[in-house]
Design a protein with these regions (language model features):
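N-terminal hydrophobic/helix-forming segments and targeting peptides
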Residues: 1-279
Length: 279
């Protein structure tokens, strides 16, 4: 692994344990980590309830702990062991229930029996736990204690932005997501590679184009950002790329624009044809 690759990997290792979501302290902690490496990053907050076109910024969610205690006293689905165990945006709960009721709040993947699924419920208040199908099959009848120490409150959605000026005002737009918890490909691959790209762009001595780069929560973060910057974006952006799920061992790929012949499309095809692009 080269020096840049090692740095990218080290950043991912540091960021992996953080519990990120659409909002909350995990996103702030992630952006602060990035800012420590890239001081030019500006962190912005959009208050809960803010109208963004026909969407509304949701309440802020934070989770401190969560687990299930089985009939034998064993603690399972422990949030502190793996933050994927808690359904994202779960409402708080602390009660004893029977297995039959518990099952209604459990999520697993039969076709991937060792995997813990990633489940969220951003806009429908509920609580739930995620576990591997192998662990699910071990559950037996009896009384279980379920506890999720979470909080939903009016707060804000957080995103980071950096602008790198070039000789002209026309911009290349890059975005990447910072809202998934402990997942490497879908999502951390995007932010850490984007960090490396920023460092590379900063070293270019004669940049023709300017660059606008954002670290945002998926969907609502994009909508919130565009709603606040639409005039500048329409005026200056000539190409844009969303950098996500680029950490697996499959071929590089891109999703074409609706038109198929924009500058973004042409650049992507030109670059990918020299790597592993197949028409």
């Amino acid at each position: 692994m080269n020096i840049v690759g090692q740095k990218i990997y080290d950043w991912a290792v540091d960021l992996f344990p953080i519990n990120r979501s659409l909002s909350g302290n995990g996103v702030r902690q992630t952006l602060q980590y990035i800012k420590n490496i890239i001081p030019e990053l500006e962190v912005n907050e959009v208050p809960s309830g803010t109208k963004c076109f026909d969407w509304t910024v949701p309440q802020e969610w934070n989770c401190g702990d969560g687990y299930i205690v089985d009939p034998d006293g064993n603690k399972i689905c422990n949030f502190k062991a793996n933050n994927l165990h808690i359904v994202g945006y779960s409402i708080p709960v602390d009660k004893e229930i029977e297995l039959e009721e518990l099952i209604e709040h459990l999520y697993y993947l039969e076709d991937q029996p060792t995997a813990i699924p990633y489940i969220t419920s951003y806009y429908s208040p509920r609580w739930g736990f995620c576990l591997s199908f192998n662990e699910f099959q071990k559950l037996k009848k009896g009384t279980y204690r379920v506890k999720i120490d979470s909080e939903l409150k009016d707060g804000s959605l957080t995103y980071g932005e950096i602008k790198l000026k070039g000789r002209i005002e026309k911009e290349i737009f890059l975005s990447t997501y910072v809202c998934h918890p402990s997942m490497a490909n879908n999502e951390l691959s995007g932010p850490v590679v984007t960090m490396a790209l920023i460092n590379f762009i900063k070293l270019l001595k004669d940049r023709k184009h300017s660059y606008r780069i954002v670290f945002i929560p998926e969907t609502i973060g994009s909508i919130a950002y565009i709603s606040r910057n639409i005039d500048d974006m329409k005026k200056n952006i000539i190409a844009g790329f969303n950098i996500t799920t680029i950490g697996d061992d499959r071929n590089y790929s891109y999703i074409p624009t609706r038109y198929g012949n924009t500058l973004s499309d042409k650049v992507s095809k030109h670059v990918l044809q020299d790597i592993d692009y197949v028409e």
